[in-house]
Amino acid sequence: MILVLVVMTIHWRQKKEMQITTVLRPSVKETNSFYTSNRQPLQPLSFIKLPVGNIKPGGWIKKYLELQRDGLTGHLNEISAWLDKNNNAWYSVDNKGDHGWEEVPYWLKGYGDLAYLLHDDKMIAETKSWLEKVIRSQRPDGFFGPDKFTGPASTVANNDNPKGLIDLWPNMIMLWCLQSYYEYSSDHRVIDLMERYFKWESKVPDSSFLESYWENSRGGDNLYSIYWLYNITGESWLLDLAKKVHGNTADWTQKNNLPNWHNVNVAQCFREPATYYMQTKDSFYLQASYNDFNLIRSIYGQVPGGMFGADENAREGYTDPRQGVETCGMVEEMASDEIMLRITGDPFWADHCEEVAFNTYPAAVMPDFKSLRYITSPNMAVSDSLNHSPGIENSGPYLMMNPFSSRCCQHNHTQGWPYYAENMWMATPDNGLVAMLYNSSDVTAKVGGGETVTLREETHYPFENTVKIKVIAAHSSKFPLYLRVPAWCDSASIRVNDVALKFASTPSSYVRIENEWKNGDYISIVLPMKIQTTRWPKNKNSVSINYGPLTFSLKIKEEYKKADSRQGALEEAKWQPSADPAKWPAYEIIPETAWNYGIPEKELNKINLSETFQVKRKSWPKNDFPFENSSTPIYIVTNGKKLPLWKIDKYGLCDTLPPSPVITKTSLEQIELIPMGAARLRISAFPVIK
């Protein structure tokens, strides 16, 4: 059971009473009157997702979404052969074709939500053209989608699918696409399709249900969709199906072990027990998800950036920060964090989502969002077209930025920022709202007694520490507004209409302000940031430098070498004949300055770290995009020393970290650090110099 812990309550009077409470979790004794939450007997949700479209992004997140629209996400259907509508099993009238597996729903999952967030009519129409085919594909027995898949798991027996059974994994993704469409459109055909499909699933014998590798690992996504439908229809047979799905899914509740160590599976599937916990209310399942999260990181995640080393699979002995993770893994981790946050209310998951979103995911794509790479690492001195195996697990050009390549990540990247934007605000069980992932936006929602309000948030967070919120409302409304205090912040301050509030500023908490809010009210939140260091004893005692939610990398001058996307593509890549490599080039990124620096121990041991790690600021970028090496609005100046023996190794990667403390006779130099999300070549885990 999630306990509600009230730290202190203070009453403060303006014209009417305002109640201010610091809580570690929201109370779930009430049920939100306006937005779909968990029905009985499911465990009540701590926070409730608002329908897509209720949040209008602004500031840098809007710019990022526009870059997606104008870049790879918005135009991948012109490039990828898997998205070609000709003879596509997802688009055909008879559910047959020579291609059609996970790629279409992967792409559509983020493409559609991006369309709804930006209210882009052209993209919405394109989304609907696919979903109309999906809805019409449903057979009389309830199954929908391609009759057979041509992917790694198909109706043809292979290593992943030895029995040659129909693979349900692609349908799991498409169900999420349909749910977003229903949120946006209220098209009841989605509910009808899901009911009939789940009745079909109910009839599949356990002996042939969720048998192949991907669907077996990722059955939690199927489980999530069952609960989504149950919360709308209340049909009790769906809870029986949920038990069946959980029982036939890989066991993510093992103690000190995982069913497999594939990076995307771990990032995506560790949430499965917590999802099932909503039905059982048995804390064993909730704790299992926390255990899975901690287990992978205790061995392979002793690195900055929030992820772990599994450049396909986590491998014994490959724990250095030069090991990377797939772009797929990053966006699935963000989605898992958002779901865990709604289930548990634990602000840890918001902190972690930001850690990945700000520090790891931006570096996986080009600044113009027209290309991406398969693998990104916390320490990455080169991003080229060479084969780096076995330094990384797979053979091939996995480090190159290439819009024609990286089949799974090429399509699955789309969900990252749209899902983040949809979770910036959430509804609360007591008919309020929570500012969860701070970013510029307008949220319009029903609150209190049913009044509709808009809250306009303006901020440059995480590059600045101030967040401003303005109330826009036709009528006053009494409702609670929750403001998250991150774990790294120990002295948050809040003002309402220029009056400072008195409250207990507690890291990893929420400040709940219940008030009669009226048009023109404004709230100002200041989240003071300070330099903090993280030591990694399990990774050669290296160190990383943090400022608020941002982790910093050595600034390495990056040379971008344009290349033909066809020449540097992975062997499995396929593109449409009309795809123009001149319009969509690939890039190698080569360092033009030294990358092999360490930080002297004496710099780290000073009482006042701000003296040796001086935070500097530049003007906000005119294009509203802060994740670029040359234009990031914040940087740190400190001292470092070159380590001549730390070089590129025989696999073409930066060598593993030397054990700290390191002895070197090189001269002390002034070095510049930038947010690691803006560094596509990066050193973010530094050796410590004696």
Where do the protein language model's features map onto the residues?
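Carbohydrate-binding/catalytic loop surfaces
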Residues: N77-D98, G145-I166, N216-N231, L258-Y276, ...
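Well-ordered alpha-helical segments within folded domains of soluble proteins
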Residues: G100-Y116, I166-Y182, E215-N231, H262-M278, ...
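Long, well-ordered core segments of solenoidal/helical folds
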Residues: P26, W60-Y91, E126-F143, D192-F209, ...
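C-terminal beta-rich recognition modules with glycine/proline-rich loops and embedded aromatic residues
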Residues: M18, V23-E30, S289, A350-N359, ...
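Low-complexity, Ser/Thr/Pro/Gly-enriched N-terminal "stalk/linker" regions
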Residues: K15-E103, I124, K128-T150, H188
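Structural helix-adjacent loops and short alpha-helical linkers that scaffold large soluble proteins
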Residues: L45-P57, A115-K128, Y181-E195, Y230-K243, ...
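Solvent-exposed beta-strand/loop surfaces of large extracellular or lumenal domains
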Residues: C489-N515, T533-K538
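Extended ligand-binding groove/face enriched in aromatic
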Residues: V93-G97, A115-V245, K255
